[in-house]
Regions:
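Residues forming the flavin
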Residues: 2-3, 8-12, 18, 26, ...
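Glycine-rich flavin
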Residues: 2-5, 12, 21-28, 33-166, ...
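Flexible, glycine-rich terminal cap/loop adjacent to redox cofactors
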Residues: 8-36, 41, 48, 52-62, ...
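Hydrophobic/aromatic ligand-binding patch that stacks against planar heteroaromatic rings
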Residues: 18, 22-23, 42, 135, ...
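Glycine-rich dinucleotide-binding loop and its adjacent helix/turn
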Residues: 47, 139-192, 196, 224-225, ...
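A Rossmann-like FAD-binding core segment of flavoenzymes
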Residues: 109-112, 116-124, 130, 189-289, ...
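FAD-site-proximal beta/loop scaffold in flavoenzymes
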Residues: 152-168, 251-328
């Protein structure tokens, strides 16, 4: 007998879990279909393990770069990679248990397996069919790989989290935040690290101040940056090492090569054609602002839609979808404007709103006023390894409404959230000026710029 549900989510990542739990809280009969571990990319091979590794790299940097000038004997005999990975795994296991407990409390049926559409209301999982009035596609994304000879010798971000040991020489290929974060972590943990970017700098879509400062720090502290670097081939050598060959004739030999050139939607194995769901030329599911696909009763959230590929975005969109469908809020939807984001680089980056070039293009040069601050992060100021901290406010109009907030430096990852609330609420430069600073902090620079 075919089992019927009010709501089914395909994919047990951030968006699927958030949406299905919210629907179940409103009394809907729900099922979540996931073939792998709960939590999706974020928990298993993304945000969570990445942040653990970032913390580990920070600890090593604190010991070796800053500890001596603070008076500490920083002699360390060894670093145990296995201990770090075991601690990380235990933490992720606790998150899995938490998800299982919440889903169980909400009476959500968790079905282990791969789902495929039979038609717009029917799915096939493990040889059985199930139906639903509403179906959410939250299948996420996966790493992309270049089409070059020897590509199989490299690993991707998923593979990084499966490494049994930290190798001595590592190359990361990519210019986006994933590449920057991985290269920063590996460099911070002590490996000889190379970052290869196709054009003149990493993070080119960010405000120029961010990218320029990041390059400045990389040139001083690593990883070694290779610009205008287009991969041509990868050769595996007799000793097991890998040589990355570039189109311009340059090459670099390393022990491990990581592809971090972007991500693509994981929509190709669920038989969307049987349901009639439309995708764009890149394979992303086409949705409107309410997360509706072109087929009534089928929705999509998260990385498989090509929207902002961040965990909190998928969570927020998924919850709002369930509020609209099951809590009598017909206009509930996620506002995708002014979404804050942090890059866990070394040092961290925080940004929300328009970059300076975007603001000038949108409003005109005569309507834009920019405030900047540049200083040495206090944490590093008493050491020989001084690191810059730079901040920018982008304001428009006679009232100087703040439309962009950007920063790079120690603590930026934690301080941005509150300032993002202010920008979202329409704060002006005068509002910031009227706020008394907290001293001594880096955050005070945002309310004392002149």
């Amino acid at each position: 007998m075919t089992k019927h549900y009010d709501y089914i989510a395909i994919g047990g990542g951030s968006g699927g879990i958030a949406s299905i739990n919210r629907a179940a809280m409103y009394g809907q009969k729900c099922a979540l279909i996931e073939a792998k571990e709960l939590g999706g990319t974020c928990v298993n091979v993304g945000c969570v393990p990445k942040k653990v590794m970032w913390h580990a790299a920070q600890i090593r940097e604190a010991i070796h770069m800053y500890g001596p000038d603070y008076g500490f004997d920083t002699t360390i005999n060894k670093f145990n990679w296995e201990t770090l990975i075991a601690s990380r795994t235990a933490y992720i296991d606790r998150i899995h248990t938490s998800y299982e407990n919440v889903l169980g409390k909400n009476n959500v049926d968790v079905i282990k397996g791969f789902a495929r559409f039979v038609d717009a209301k029917t799915l096939e999982v493990n040889g059985e069919t199930i139906t639903a009035d509403h179906i959410l596609i939250a299948t996420g994304g996966r790493p992309s790989h270049p089409d070059i000879p020897g590509v199989e010798y490299g690993i991707d971000s998923d593979g990084f989290f499966a490494l049994p040991a930290l190798l001595e020489r590592v190359a990361v290929v990519g210019a986006g935040y994933i590449a920057v974060e991985l290269a920063g972590v590996i460099n911070g943990l002590g490996a000889k690290t190379h970052l290869f970017v196709r054009k003149h700098a990493p993070l080119r879509s960010f405000d120029p101040m961010i990218s320029e400062t990041l390059v400045e720090v990389m040139n001083a502290e690593g990883p070694q940056l290779h610009t205008n670097a287009i991969p041509k081939a990868v050769v595996k050598n007799a000793d097991g090492s890998l040589t990355l060959e570039l189109e311009d004739g340059r090459s670099e030999t390393v022990d491990c090569l990581i592809w971090a050139i972007g991500r693509e939607p994981a929509n190709d194995n669920i038989n969307l054609e049987a349901a009639g769901v439309k995708t764009n030329e890149k394979g992303y599911i086409v949705v409107d602002k309410y997360q509706n696909t072109n087929i009534e009763g089928i929705y999509a959230v998260g990385d498989n839609t090509g929207a902002v590929e961040l965990t909190p975005v998928a969570v927020a969109a998924g919850r709002r979808l369930s509020e609209r469908l099951f809590n009598n809020k017909p206009d509930e939807h996620l506002d995708y404007s002014n979404i804050p984001t942090v890059v866990f680089s070394h040092p961290p980056i925080g940004t929300v709103g328009l970059t300076e070039p975007q603001a000038r293009e949108q409003y005109g040069d005569d309507q834009v006023k920019v405030y900047k601050s540049s200083f040495t992060a206090m944490y590093t100021a008493v050491t020989t390894h001084r690191q810059p901290c730079r901040m920018k406010l982008v304001c428009v109009g006679p009232e100087e409404k703040i439309v962009g907030i950007h920063g790079i430096g120690f603590g930026m990852d934690e301080m941005l959230q509150g300032f993002a609330v202010a920008l979202k609420m329409g704060a002006t430069k005068k509002d910031f000026d009227n706020t008394v600073a907290i001293h001594p902090t880096a955050a005070e620079e945002f309310v004392t710029m002149r």
